[in-house]
């Protein structure tokens, strides 16, 4: 027997074909959300407060200081928040200290700081009753970047940019004349020496001393001449910079100094963040810059006078490692003191080394380092600027390397915690201005923190972020896999990110650093391709927000692959050679072969096993969760695999889902971590279990109660239904499944079913990927799903009185009210069809709406029914089903309703949708199709043992698409069905063709895995043997019921008077320019005329036509379309005298758009109302005559 048994949870065993020993379990798949939010609560929020506070008043006599904060208990539970359309949030209380510096008085007070949304255990937020997710953002990391550019003459120039987390950009660039310029915050460029002089190093010799003698430096110094001898060089430089930054304003050296300090050296205005400081120190680090350079001077230990390295030595990795402590210490450190006019007057410590120029052995190049400022230095320092300039000048000498902007070492993730902290900071900054004014205006003696703090800007910023940010998204809740994928999504869009239109090909493309960090397969098709990605299965964020991936360490001394796990970011990995997970190993862990496949930077090639540093942890670390659920992924073309991964996320939860016979072993973990199942929080024994509740007694005697959701409406309108798995007396351990969620079976993801599939044509019905299906799948509810739709009706106060929910609806027969209760609300369990009343509601009608007869009747009989009109909630088109639930919210019950709303009624209607012609189906390999025909079971082809086939697919769908995985799954699935087992074939480590055939033979199938099929209609065998097997097929969310749409009478657009478009607006079908050509080609003039007039925007004509049709008269001639009038008006607005003349040159009067319609022109709706009114009046007249007769 090929393969070995593996247990997944307590309910499923699979035969696995994996050969690679897994040394690391998958991490919790939603930790990117939960860890980041927890981080924010533990440290991020405190950091934001400490950044903005203390706040001083303008006279600096008072300080408002931050002491601490506390989150109290949430107002609503999760379920209550969902029901009441509220947010699941906790009140936050912040303690402030107000210090009066003149009197020394201190007032400490706790201030309510608004309600802060809290993340649920599932990694989601509940905002206004809807479940939302904050998508992590992929942005360019703060730091220093160097790039090269080639001009039109083929000359190579260099550029450099310092990008902060917030603050001004500082750029350097060279031009065609070999002069180096700098730009501050995208303004006009100035010679870079001007900025050096402004920093207090004004002499030409001083500049050459710092940077060394090079052509770029000399050329720039020549360009940067001393124009005004009355100013010092530094003052002149400062004024020149000020002129660039604030053109047109009077320039003084003092104002320029304070401006530069504010731009770069003030931590409140300029912030590199921890990650920016880390990246700058790493890029400007001398150990990497000196690597493989020839040193041009003796390196001498300053304390002992010992020569550490002699001039002429090549600085190899070993040489650098031997003096690393000295380089990190005080080796070659020089103190430069700026002159008195400088922006920053503190001494600047630089570390300088002289090396031989790689291009010219007779020249010496100076390499300047920033002497590694500490991590907590978040602003730029003069040493950083000088070291950056040095690196930039060194590039022209061939020392150093340019950066690849798409490298994942230069792109980082802003997860939910950081995004929230940024938003909170914006709110606090707005509040700060407000507080400062209040502190200055009001009397110091009586002030308390409560009085000067206005929390509205903070709560508004947070609310705005959750409600309308591009990164706060309505959770994709089609099925548990789509939830999980959404939580692990990485978007390059959003504020501070890219825009779709500007993003080029390079940003979207797969980069070698994506390996193990971002999935190369799972990304949307269309304009967002490559901009929205998914975290790979083992991906994990470090403290700086860079994605790490795990590797097994190779012990270089023994050559053995250890089980020690090392997590590496992309730029750390660049220094090492990594072998693949499937490298063959001996018993002792050493490599079995001399040469192994591996990766170093962007190169995939064979390496000697002796130089390998790390080995991949698992073959599936390359791909995301959805991609890892595709069996035989290695046999599919990448484009189709992309569709397969994306379509699994669109699967509709079925009534009775089944886990796949052929899985990948990922189904269990995905279901477990998705948050859609009920998972045990502690060990214990089940003491009570039913469909809605499970109670578990813990070992310490306490009780855990788990609630099981039944048929709740999900965000996608599908049924979110959990099924209890445990029985009374069962022992459960922490992490066990207590109940399956939607699309799960026995604790495994189960998105579809396992039908018997044959690759064959049948009467041409599976032309172009169409799917032929057996009626069994309809009758036995194999592909039946439940959908829940929510409808609501609210009563408001109007000018004429309040609206009412009632059973007494004018002009509605008793038959239509049979399922309404005494209040006029539909009963639960009622079957409703389109147009049925769900909530009876009447709205007061003004006197002006009444006709003369109605007023007379009102006067005689005091008949109230005439004063209201029917505004009941009715079932819309395609909305028929069974009423599942009704919720009523009123002010009297203490429910929070919008202002002006007195009562809100929500009705939930459940639909049971069987699969039908027009529904979309798919396999897991991107093989999608539409159901074209449902054939009676007796007509379907059948196997020799009499089993009818369930689905027939077109064999032509396989070769050109190159997704051969589906064929392998088909054969293995049939073997699994015959053997009565489930199989796991993990991606890139699954069943080989030998395993496949061995299993096929074990199952007693023919050696080619094909079979004779018999025609169900004739009983004759088909000419050729057919591939028949079991394939996992899913039903997708694109169902024909949601797309079918027809219009007879409906709404029109206000300006053009043409029908609206789309199903949601009950619109018409657009008959466009090309369709008009088609009818013109056939000469179908009358058909064309009525399409362009009655059916579109001939307002008068369509009303007369409607009238004629209802009264059975001939249809009159059409008039002038409204769009013609619009054209005339548009030309008149351009000042053209445009008139319409008839054959006799008489002017034709066009009805003016703004004059309102003529009285004799009625709307279609008015005609409909008139008909109803006429019937009602006839009824009324009958009642009157009856009354008269009785009298």
UniProtKB/Swiss-Prot annotation:
Compositionally skewed regions (Low complexity) per UniProt: 1182-1191
Xref: Pfam families: RNA_pol_Rpb2_1, RNA_pol_Rpb2_2, RNA_pol_Rpb2_3, RNA_pol_Rpb2_45, RNA_pol_Rpb2_6, RNA_pol_Rpb2_7
Enzyme class: transferase
Skewed-composition ranges (Basic and acidic residues): 1171-1181
Source organism superkingdom: Bacteria
UniProt xrefs under InterPro entries: DNA-dir_RNA_pol_bsu_ext_1_sf, DNA-dir_RNA_pol_bsu_external_1, DNA-dir_RNA_pol_su2, DNA-dir_RNAP_su2_dom, DNA-dir_RNAP_su2_hyb_sf, RNA_pol_bsu_bac, RNA_pol_bsu_CS, RNA_pol_bsu_protrusion
NCBIfam families: PRK00405.1, rpoB
Protein name: DNA-directed RNA polymerase subunit beta
